[in-house]
């Protein structure tokens, strides 16, 4: 199976060339669609997601979509080669993007061969269940939430090193009956479109 889902443990830009090469090597990338949520000064931050691809594909088209503030006609974005789901407030991302319409769009695009890259919150919400670290919510509690269900045999934790999240992850693992795979800030878990692990890049 091809490498199509890339779960990034941290924030952009992608610094590891091995990861970049896996994304860009197998296909011509003409259009990237980035799903994010509104926050002050969000626009300048967007180039962190795309700069690494811009250098490979100078004629790249990029769209930035904020599902929390606008209605999206997904049919307008069926020619995307890469879909990026950004990072930020995990619970807000879950509230915005975990719904049947978005799930249908992502699954359709995976079946068409598009690559899906999730950063931090955007990686977490792709799982069937989502581990929200106490470092990642204002209640400072471990939370297990529902996600989009692109993978189900495991959960992930993000920012594992910078959040020093081992004890929290181990406690959360007792609440779910599958392993939680820790991802450091610069790590990437690579899956096929069915959610099977192909490799972990640290």
Give the location of each predicted region:
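N-terminal beta1-alpha1 cap of cysteine-dependent amidohydrolase-like domains
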Residues: 1-82
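Structural motif
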Residues: 7, 82-86, 117-118, 155-156
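Glycine-centered flexibility sites
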Residues: 9, 87-88, 118, 122, ...
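Short, flexible loop segments at the rims of nucleotide/cofactor-binding pockets, characterized by
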Residues: 9-13, 61-65, 93-96, 135, ...
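Short, glycine/serine-rich, charged loops/turns that create anion-binding
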Residues: 12, 39, 89, 123, ...
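Short, surface-exposed connector motifs at secondary-structure boundaries
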Residues: 29-33, 88-89, 152
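Non-catalytic interaction surface on structured domains
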Residues: 35-39, 63-76, 85-114
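Active-site-adjacent pocket-lining segments in enzyme domains
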Residues: 79, 94-115, 122-202
């Amino acid at each position: 199976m091809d490498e199509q889902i890339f779960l990034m443990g941290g924030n952009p830009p992608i610094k590891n060339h091995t990861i970049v090469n896996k994304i860009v090597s197998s296909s011509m990338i003409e259009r990237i669609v980035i799903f994010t949520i509104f926050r002050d000064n969000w626009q300048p931050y967007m180039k962190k997601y795309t700069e690494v691809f811009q250098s490979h594909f100078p004629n790249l088209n990029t769209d930035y979509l904020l599902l929390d503030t606008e209605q999206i006609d997904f049919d307008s974005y069926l020619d995307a080669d890469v879909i990026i789901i950004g990072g930020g407030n995990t619970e807000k991302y879950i509230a915005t993007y975990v719904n049947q319409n978005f799930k249908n769009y992502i699954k359709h695009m995976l079946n068409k061969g598009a690559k899906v890259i999730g950063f931090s919150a955007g990686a977490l919400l792709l799982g069937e269940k989502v581990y929200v670290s106490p470092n990642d919510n204002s209640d400072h509690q471990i939370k297990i939430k529902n996600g989009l269900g692109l993978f189900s045999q495991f959960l992930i934790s993000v920012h594992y090193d910078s959040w020093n999240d081992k004890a929290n992850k181990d406690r959360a693992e007792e609440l779910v009956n599958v392993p939680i795979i820790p991802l450091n800030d610069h790590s990437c878990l690579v899956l096929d479109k069915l959610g099977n692990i192909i490799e972990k890049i640290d």
